[in-house]
Structure formats: C-alpha cells, structure tokens
Amino acid sequence: MRRFLVALALAAAAVPASAADDPAVAVVDGLYARFDATVKNGAGTLKDRVDAVGPTLERSFDYPAMVRLAIGAKWADFTPEQQGAITEAFRRNFVVTYANRLARAAGAKFEVTRKSEPSGSNQRVLTHVTTPDGDDSQIDFVVNADNRIQDVLLNGNVSEIAGQRTTLGPPLKAGGADGVLKFLRQRTDGMLAAKPAP
C-alpha cells in the first residue's frame, strides 16, 4: 500500500502555478508534469514509460546521494569502481521501479504547496494525494541544496531511502558490494522481463 500511494503521488496531474521563486517546488512541479504527460493518453508499455520519465528522473533525483544513504557506513569501504557500478545499477532500478509504479497510479488528485519548508540542511516540499477510492496521504519530497530530490516521505515520516536500506541490507550483509550490485541488476531485469498484467 505504501508503494502504491507513492506511485499515486508521482502520477497525479501537476497544479499549474509558477514556482520560479522556489526552486525546490519547481523541481517537484516538473516531476509531476512529466508523469502526468506520460500517462495522459494511457500507460503504454513499461519500456515506453522508462523512456518517457527517465530523463526527468535523472534531472530531479540525486542518485549518488540516495544510494550512499541507502547503503550507509559500508559505502566508504567500497572502491570507486564499485561505487560507480552500484550507483548506475541503483539509478536504473529506480527508474524502472517508478515507471512500473506509474502504470498503477492514474486517477489520483493532489495538491502541492507553493513553497518549501526547511528540513535540516534540505527543503521539504509537501504534497497531498487523494486516491481514486478516497484515501488521503501526505507525500513529501526532500530536496537538497543542489535542488535534487534525495528522499520521498509518505505521511511525513515513511522514508523511501529507509525502505531501500532495508531492502539492500540482506544482499549487502551476504555479499558486500558485489551482492548489492547483483541484487539491483536482477531486480531490475526481473521487472523488465515480467509480462504485463492482463
């Protein structure tokens, strides 16, 4: 349910308003606009959605910061080559995961605050999502000083990065950097190979 609600937030139609005076809000507005355009005429195939949203995700999310936070202290033990390979595998997995969620997220409504609020050294952009069946959720985007999103929070405290840390923990413990890399690649390839639901 948590992943579905996050997906709903990402697929909602953007609220037309200028966010030029708040770069953090502008990032979220641009993200929503791209997702909305992607599913406006139907979800299409997973590959279609990956191609459509990948560049916007690349501009909007700080993958190096996200994977570093998801791995935790062990990140410093990896070689630069391992860090680079894992970051790329994380990026690819993230894009495919969000494109996959997008197929299930049409029909939601949401509101974006027109300004961000401080959250430590970052800014938090609050959005409110209403699913087609009437469920309400708060989805916050944590935007860093480089105006890149580095976390997504459900109901203000359920962290996407914390979820990634939990997911990556077992392969990290069992196989270190190689275990994480293998896990991410296999999970991504599995989503791409899956047959669409009827």
Predicted regions and their residues:
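Extracytoplasmic
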Residues: P23, G30-Y32, E58, E81, ...
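Soluble periplasmic/extracytoplasmic beta-strand elements of cell-envelope proteins
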Residues: R34, T87, E111, L126-H128, ...
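Bacterial N-terminal signal peptides that target proteins for export
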Residues: M1-V6
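N-terminal signal peptide c-region/cleavage motif recognized by signal peptidases
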Residues: A14-P16
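Early exported N-terminus immediately downstream of N-terminal targeting peptides
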Residues: D21-Y98
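Non-transmembrane domains of secretory- and envelope-associated proteins
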Residues: N157-P198
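Surface-exposed, charged secondary-structure patches
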Residues: V95-S137, L184-P198
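Short beta-strand edge/turn micro-motifs at domain boundaries
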Residues: D136-T166
